[in-house]
Structure formats: structure tokens, C-alpha cells
Amino acid sequence: VKAADWIHCNSMSELGPNHWYTEDPVKYSAFHPNNIIVSNRQTQTSFIIDKKTKKIVWHIGPDYYSDSVWYLNGEPQKGRALGRLGQIVGQHHTHMIPDGLPGAGNIMIYDNGGYSGYGPRNPATPTGWSNSRRDYSRVIEFNPVTLEKVWEHSAATMGLREGYKFYSDYVSSAQRLPNGNTLITNGAVGQLQEVTPDNEIVWGYISPWYNPNGKFNLVYRAYRVPYDYVPQIKKPEEYAVTPPENAEWRIPASKTPYKG
């Protein structure tokens, strides 16, 4: 079989300093700060490579059933942990939350849904290529030692019945911010959102830049950086924004508010 991009690696980064390795460098040797964490979308796998030995020392996927096996320090782990975490499909931006941020040491993933994986063919995929399908996304944060999920952002956690209302089937990312909120890039729809730990959207932006045919405003990934990263621009004044009443809006060109 001839195929291109059969792994689709979309993120790779050093773990950096973390409390696991600081607490016990032998027990948690998998989390050496120099080790590299990798996300492979098409194979539905995320893993950590020991930079010295070149061996995989932590690994989840491609299956996330209650009887699926995962690996810690190169040793197989059993139990129901992967089943509780839930199937991950077509993920992006697997990374460890850096030291100094809320949730430091946990793993965060933008679990796209959409399509990925390999397996038995079915009507949706006669070749068995991308045989995993799901029409919603979620951002998950979990403990890398127990795989216990500690936070999720999705349509369901926002109280929405329609999963597609939080959905980007490719690209995308998530970044923990110093204030405990999370900056999420729903890349396929060109949307950035800052959400609180309680899943409230407190800031949003939709890219106005579309491709020539006007159908795509894709944003691959976005990060929030400190003002001093761009010293040539004067630091702006920040001010609090009061959320508007949902039942009040203004008709364009009218100064009179309409209340429903």
C-alpha cells in the first residue's frame, strides 16, 4: 500500500522542568525535562521519547478501551484508565503544562474528533484508513501517571446538546494561561477562545482572513505571549469588560436598546 503522511506528527516538544521528575527522578524517569513528547494524529497515539536512550517511555493509544494497555517508564499498565479517559481521535498539540502554571505537570490535548486511525474497513472507510470517526471536539487535561481526567472543555461541559458546536476536525491547540484560563484554537473554523476552568467563554476572536474562494479562515495554532515579547509595541492599557445582557441588543444605526 502506498500512502503519504501515514503518521501525521503535529507537535513535538521537550517536557521541560516538572514536579514529577523533581519529586522522584527514578520513579518518574519518563518525565525527565529533556525528554520529548510527541503527538501523532493519524495513529491516535501520544508518547514520550527518552532523549538519551531513544526509547519510548510513556505511551497512550491508539485504542482507549477499558482493557487497553498503556505504558509508563516503558512498562505496560493495565486497568480501566484509558476507558475512563475516553477514545481520542485525530488529536493535536499533546504537551505537558509547564511549571509555574495552574495544572503544571498534567498533559493537555486538543482531541479533535473528525477522522483518524487504522482498522477494519467499514462503509465509512472501505480501505480501513481513518476508520475512527466522531463529530465533536474536546480539550482534555489529565494526570500522566494515573490518566485521571482533571478537566475537559467541550460542547457537553458548556451545557450544549449538539456536539458539533465545539468542533474542529483538524489543526487546533490549547494553551494554559497564568490566570488559570485556557486559550483554545478551534483552527478549522478560525476561532480563538479563552475559557475559564468553569467552561465560561470570556474572550473570543474569529479570523476575518479567508482564502480566495471565501470558504476557509483556518488558523493552525495560536499562543498568547507576554507584551515584552514585542518590545517595539507600546504595552496597551488593559480594562475589565462587563458581559452584556443576553436579552439586550441594538439594532444597527439605532441608539435605542431593544429588550426582549
Q: Where is each model-derived feature located?
A:
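Histidine-/acidic-rich catalytic cores in large beta-rich domains
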Residues: V1-G260
